[in-house]
């Protein structure tokens, strides 16, 4: 009886083991097969760019000021007017400059008359001195009279020299007065558009220490872009790199140029440091305007016809620019070591390790998993 119970117990244990094995086998056979997100490796182009926000300004902008003091009698332009080089923009009351010219001219006339008188007196002094010399030979006059005549002649000669110096000084004053009269006419130093008027007609300007600004001219045929670049990106920039931008009102049109320079002085914005990279673009149609916001792209690298894969396909690093990559072949995955080159925010160049047509794993998902 005891032996039967032992045999029965063994059968039960064996049955449990078999059932457990069958359940395990069923689970293995019915386990969901992993599915992979893959990409076929193909040649393509890879660009690496720095993104920045910029502002537009005119390439050439000039503050037109007054070089003489006085009331702005007329202002012939308004904001937005287009002007030509040497076009009359305004006039400062010329009365003071005209009166100064008249005053200096009158002084010059007086000095020239004095010079004529001094020349006549010098001529008389020379005649007197010659006569005194002849009389002195006959002892008809004393040596003192002869010396007096010589002194008188020298004094008259010196008077002419003094008058000549005064004439030169006043001639210079006359030239300055005429120049000041010319300065009362404010003309455009270049062709451009009036973008700002600082002094209104009727206001008085004082040019005692520095030229007061009347208006601002901008040449809008070419624009200067100032791109605000972070300190992390600025180390990659250098003159000559390609740059392009779009504006908010026309995101489909690209305006292209080359980096001109990177200003050395940074700007601090909310504890972040930024530098300004500048480049020029033509504006023949006048569509670009002052202070427009530009979405700037500065191209760091541009490689053509190279093998690229997404950054998400890179596995663990195994050395300098070397990574593991999973390949899918005949439903099975294999790891392969690759060497990378240029990269951007989404893709990377494969220098070695893959061929066109290889299928790389970029992700893995199981059926029923949330996508």
Curated annotation (Swiss-Prot):
It is found in: Cell inner membrane. Residues 32-371 are periplasmic. Residues 1-10 are cytoplasmic. Induction: Expressed at very low levels under standard laboratory conditions. Changing residue 357 to C/S: Does not affect susceptibility to macrolides. Keywords: Antibiotic resistance, Cell inner membrane, Cell membrane, Coiled coil, Membrane, Transmembrane, Transmembrane helix, Transport. Changing residue 357 to A: 2-fold increase in susceptibility to macrolides. Does not stimulate MacB ATPase activity. InterPro entries: CusB_D23 (IPR032317), MacA_alpha-hairpin_sf (IPR030190), RND_pump_MFP (IPR006143). The chain crosses the membrane at residues 11-31. It is a single-pass membrane protein. GO terms for molecular function: efflux transmembrane transporter activity; identical protein binding; polymyxin transmembrane transporter activity. GO terms for biological process: polymyxin transport; response to antibiotic; xenobiotic detoxification by transmembrane export across the plasma membrane. Disulfide bonds: none annotated. The keyword tRNA processing does not apply. Residues 92-137 form a coiled coil. One of its GO terms (cellular component) is membrane. Part of the tripartite efflux system MacAB-TolC. MacA stimulates the ATPase activity of MacB by promoting the closed ATP-bound state of MacB, increases the capacity of MacB to bind macrolides such as erythromycin, and provides a physical link between MacB and TolC. When overexpressed, the system confers resistance against macrolides composed of 14- and 15-membered lactones but no or weak resistance against 16-membered ones. In addition, MacA binds tightly rough-core lipopolysaccharide (R-LPS), suggesting that the system could also transport R-LPS or a similar glycolipid. The periplasmic domain is sufficient to bind MacB. The membrane proximal (MP) region plays a critical role in the stimulation of MacB ATPase activity. Belongs to the membrane fusion protein (MFP) (TC 8.A.1) family. Homohexamer. Part of the tripartite efflux system MacAB-TolC, which is composed of an inner membrane transporter, MacB, a periplasmic membrane fusion protein, MacA, and an outer membrane component, TolC. The complex forms a large protein conduit and can translocate molecules across both the inner and outer membranes. MacA interacts with MacB and TolC, and this interaction changes its conformation. This is Macrolide export protein MacA. The gene is macA.
């Amino acid at each position: 009886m005891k032996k039967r119970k032992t045999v029965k117990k063994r059968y039960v244990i064996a049955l449990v083991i078999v059932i457990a094995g069958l359940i395990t086998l069923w689970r293995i056979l019915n386990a969901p097969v992993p599915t992979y997100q893959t990409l076929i490796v193909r040649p393509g182009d890879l660009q690496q760019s720095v993104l920045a926000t910029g502002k537009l300004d005119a390439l050439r902008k000039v503050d037109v000021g007054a070089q003489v003091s006085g009331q702005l009698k007329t202002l012939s332009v308004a904001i937005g007017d287009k002007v030509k080089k040497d076009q009359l923009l305004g006039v400062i009351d010329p009365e003071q400059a005209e009166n100064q010219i008249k005053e200096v001219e009158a002084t010059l006339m007086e000095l020239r008359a004095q010079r004529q008188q001094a020349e006549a007196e010098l001529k008389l002094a020379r005649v007197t001195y010659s006569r005194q010399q002849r009389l002195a030979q006959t002892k008809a006059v004393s040596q003192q009279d002869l010396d007096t005549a010589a002194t008188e002649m020298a004094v008259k000669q010196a008077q002419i020299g003094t008058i000549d110096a005064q004439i030169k000084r006043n001639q210079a004053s006359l030239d300055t007065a005429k120049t000041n009269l010319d300065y009362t006419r404010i003309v455009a130093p270049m062709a451009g558009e009036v973008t700002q008027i600082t002094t209104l007609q009727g206001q008085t300007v004082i040019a005692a220490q520095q030229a007061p600004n009347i208006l601002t001219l901008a040449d809008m045929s070419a624009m200067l872009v100032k791109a605000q670049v972070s300190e992390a990106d600025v180390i990659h920039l250098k003159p000559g790199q390609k740059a392009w931008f779009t504006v908010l009102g026309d995101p489909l049109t690209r305006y292209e140029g080359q980096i001109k320079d990177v200003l050395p002085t940074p700007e601090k914005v909310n504890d972040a440091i930024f530098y300004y990279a500048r480049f020029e673009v033509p504006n023949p149609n006048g569509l670009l305007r002052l202070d427009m916001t530009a979405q700037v792209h500065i191209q760091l690298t541009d490689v053509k016809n190279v093998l690229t894969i997404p950054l998400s396909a890179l596995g663990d690093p195994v050395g300098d620019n070397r990574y593991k990559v999973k390949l899918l072949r005949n439903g099975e995955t294999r790891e392969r070591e690759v060497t990378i080159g240029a990269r951007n925010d989404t893709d990377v160049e494969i220098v070695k390790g893959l061929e066109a047509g290889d299928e790389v794993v970029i992700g893995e998902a199981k059926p029923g998993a949330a996508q």
